From Swiss-Prot:
Pfam families: Ubie_methyltran
Keyword set includes Transferase: yes
PROSITE patterns xrefs: SAM_MT_UBIE (PS51608), UBIE_1 (PS01183), UBIE_2 (PS01184)
Assigned EC number: 2.1.1.163, 2.1.1.201
Similarity comment: family membership: Belongs to the class I-like SAM-binding methyltransferase superfamily. MenG/UbiE family.
Binding site for S-adenosyl-L-methionine: T75, D96, N123, A124
Protein name per UniProt: Ubiquinone/menaquinone biosynthesis C-methyltransferase UbiE
Any one GO molecular-function label of the UniProt entry: 2-methoxy-6-polyprenyl-1,4-benzoquinol methyltransferase activity
GO terms under biological process: aerobic respiration; menaquinone biosynthetic process; methylation
Metabolic or biological pathway, per its Swiss-Prot or TrEMBL entry: Quinol/quinone metabolism; menaquinone biosynthesis; menaquinol from 1,4-dihydroxy-2-naphthoate: step 2/2; Cofactor biosynthesis; ubiquinone biosynthesis
Role noted for this protein: Methyltransferase required for the conversion of demethylmenaquinol (DMKH2) to menaquinol (MKH2) and the conversion of 2-polyprenyl-6-methoxy-1,4-benzoquinol (DDMQH2) to 2-polyprenyl-3-methyl-6-methoxy-1,4-benzoquinol (DMQH2).
Keyword tags: Menaquinone biosynthesis, Methyltransferase, S-adenosyl-L-methionine, Transferase, Ubiquinone biosynthesis
Keyword Methyltransferase included in the entry's annotation: yes
């Protein structure tokens, strides 16, 4: 967040800090029903490989109890993958601030994974969960929408038990010469058009593209993760830097 503590980025605009969450909620309420379809269209299906890479890094236990908190995971995409990869004692709590996204997730879950998944309404900056209650915390393509990222990271640290792991999958900054220009042209010209055509909402997808550009560089975000108390902080760039997996451990 910028030095001005009363305002923050909303895409390329500056808005009062206390207004951002409401605006973000409206974006995701608008796109919830088409969210996963749009992810396929926007990424050409690559988001599936990126999420698989996140689950491979997570490695949920197949032989012992494993408790995962997936934040901003309303539609259940990460949760379902983790449950399929883990053992019978893997349990996922999906937390999202947006009721429309949670409704999609509950509908998709149906009767699958009975007793192994729950959906909770909550704010990443003030998790309604006890200290040290999870083995791992994941957040995929969500942390850039949080008004106070440092608070979300502090909350992630709080709810993890010692030895727990923080994993964040987020869009990043393309580092391949030539690809950066192609990616920018695609992002700013094509994605909002797809949003208008498929989801009936050009402006929400324009915000999502702009929010990617405002997100910190991998090095800067690593510094924020370390400031929250995490150790052994690393990141791995995917697809030429289009996105990255960030990792940190709670040692004590």
């Amino acid at each position: 967040m910028a030095a001005d503590e009363t305002s923050t980025d909303f895409g390329f605009a500056r808005v009062p800090l206390d207004e951002k969450q409401g605006r973000v909620n409206e974006v995701f309420r608008s796109v919830a029903r088409r969210y996963d379809v749009m992810n396929d269209l926007m990424s050409g299906g690559l988001h599936r490989a990126w999420k698989s890479a996140l689950i491979s890094a997570l490695r949920p236990s197949r032989t012992r109890p494993f408790r995962l908190l997936d934040v901003a995971g309303g539609t259940g995409d990460i949760a379902f993958r983790a449950l399929q990869a883990g053992g019978p004692e893997t349990h996922v709590t999906v937390l999202d601030i947006n009721d429309a996204m949670l409704a999609v997730g509950r509908e998709r879950a149906g009767d699958r994974f009975a007793g192994r998944i729950d959906f909770v309404a909550g704010n990443a900056e003030a998790l309604p969960l006890p200290d040290g209650s999870f083995d791992a915390y994941t957040i995929a393509f969500g942390i850039r929408n949080v008004p106070r990222i440092e608070r979300a990271l502090a909350e992630a640290y709080r709810v993890l038990q010692p030895g727990g792991r923080f994993l964040c999958l987020e869009f990043s900054h393309v580092d391949v010469p030539g690809l950066d220009r192609i990616y920018d042209a695609y992002s700013f010209r094509i994605i909002p058009h797809l949003g208008a055509l498929v989801a009936g909402d050009r402006e929400s997808y324009r915000y999502l593209v702009e929010s990617i550009r405002r997100f910190p560089t991998p090095g800067a975000f690593a510094g924020m993760i370390e400031e929250a108390g995490f150790a052994h902080v690393t990141h791995r760039l995917l697809s030429g830097g289009i996105c990255a997996i960030h990792s940190g451990w709670k040692i004590a």
